[in-house]
């Protein structure tokens, strides 16, 4: 299997795991663990795993002796801010307030956001077709935020959807920022620093909440779901993302987010955690149409 095919497989697995995460994490929040407390646990657990793996690989001589250049530390701090702190805090808080399907649909706007940010940062010209697509996507996202009603424990779908959108924008910044780091360093050389910096950024938001959790009433099934989010949704998915982004462009990686609503919908509906309705279907059609126009290659 070629490196590109491995990267495509990794990107697909990321979408499957994230599609499951929308429902699995929703089962934990807010009944057993507040979103910010969950983020402290998630980022802290993943940080520990990354450092342990780095130490193991270093002791066994499986890592190059590259060191982070002082000039790249601002980029690492920025990656931690957009890819860990803002991204995860807004996503989990938003998911705790809205439904799995709505959150997954809004995440589809990420490819459009990446292209807009690329155009701003790289000074690329935006075509009329792309502007039309952005408008359609914005209408669909706004429609879902304002009118998308949810089932189950969704307590404030409008605010939740808005926070998920902020998360998508932040993730778009992260995809652009981290690209240079991946081509310069081994993944474990810089990812441990990104997560360590991110952990200290999220700690003030969630530590107080984390300390108030009554772990005695948390059932075993919830512990397994917390473990899934830490190990698979965070640790494994981050490594798979790095593998895919070494061979694929940020725009290509972002396009795989299109698969997340499919997997999230299948998983959520099969478990009775969410339902489809007219608002979600119409919003999805507008957003997907916008994404198609924005990412359509010029013939």
Where are these regions (language model features)?
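Glycine-/small-residue-enriched transmembrane alpha-helix faces in small-molecule transporters
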Residues: 1-41, 154-180, 200
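Helix-helix packing/entry segments at the starts of transmembrane helices
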Residues: 11, 15, 41, 84, ...
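Specific transmembrane alpha-helical segments of multi-pass solute transporters/efflux pumps
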Residues: 17, 21-22, 54-102, 107, ...
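Hydrophobic/small/kink-forming positions within alpha-helical transmembrane segments
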Residues: 19, 23, 80-85, 89, ...
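Membrane-interface helix termini and inter-helical loops of multi-pass transporters
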Residues: 24-35, 63-65, 96, 145-157, ...
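Hydrophobic/aromatic residues within transmembrane alpha-helices
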Residues: 28, 38, 42, 94, ...
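Transmembrane alpha-helices of multi-pass small-molecule transport proteins
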Residues: 31-86, 113, 170-177, 191-210, ...
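Hydrophobic transmembrane alpha-helices of multi-pass small-molecule transport proteins
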Residues: 50, 126-148, 202, 258, ...
């Amino acid at each position: 299997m070629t490196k590109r095919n491995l990267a495509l497989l990794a990107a697909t697995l990321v979408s499957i795991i994230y599609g499951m995460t929308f429902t699995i994490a929703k089962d934990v929040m807010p009944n057993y663990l507040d979103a910010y407390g969950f983020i402290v646990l998630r980022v802290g657990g993943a940080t520990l795993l990354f450092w342990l793996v780095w130490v193991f690989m270093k002791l066994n001589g499986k890592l190059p002796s590259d060191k982070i250049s002082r000039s790249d530390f601002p980029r690492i701090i920025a990656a931690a801010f957009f890819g860990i702190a803002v991204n995860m805090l807004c996503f989990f808080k938003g998911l705790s307030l809205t439904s799995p399907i709505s959150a997954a649909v809004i995440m589809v706007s990420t490819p459009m956001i990446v292209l807009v940010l690329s155009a701003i940062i790289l000074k690329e010209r935006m075509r009329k077709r792309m502007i039309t697509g952005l408008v359609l996507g914005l209408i669909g996202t706004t429609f879902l935020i304002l009118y998308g009603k949810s089932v189950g424990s969704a307590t404030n779908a409008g605010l939740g959807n808005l926070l998920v959108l902020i998360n998508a924008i932040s993730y778009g910044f992260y995809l652009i920022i981290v690209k240079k780091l991946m081509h310069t360093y081994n993944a474990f050389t810089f990812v441990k620093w990104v997560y360590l910096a991110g952990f200290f950024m999220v700690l003030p938001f969630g530590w107080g909440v984390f300390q108030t959790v009554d772990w005695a009433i948390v059932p075993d099934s919830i512990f397994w779901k917390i473990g899934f989010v830490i190990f698979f949704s965070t640790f494994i998915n981050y490594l798979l993302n790095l593998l895919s982004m070494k061979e694929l462009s940020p725009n290509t990686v972002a396009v795989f987010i299109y698969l997340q609503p499919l997997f999230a919908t299948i998983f959520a509906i099969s478990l009775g955690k969410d339902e489809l309705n007219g608002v979600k279907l119409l919003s999805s059609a507008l957003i997907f149409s916008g994404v198609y126009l924005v990412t359509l290659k010029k013939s």
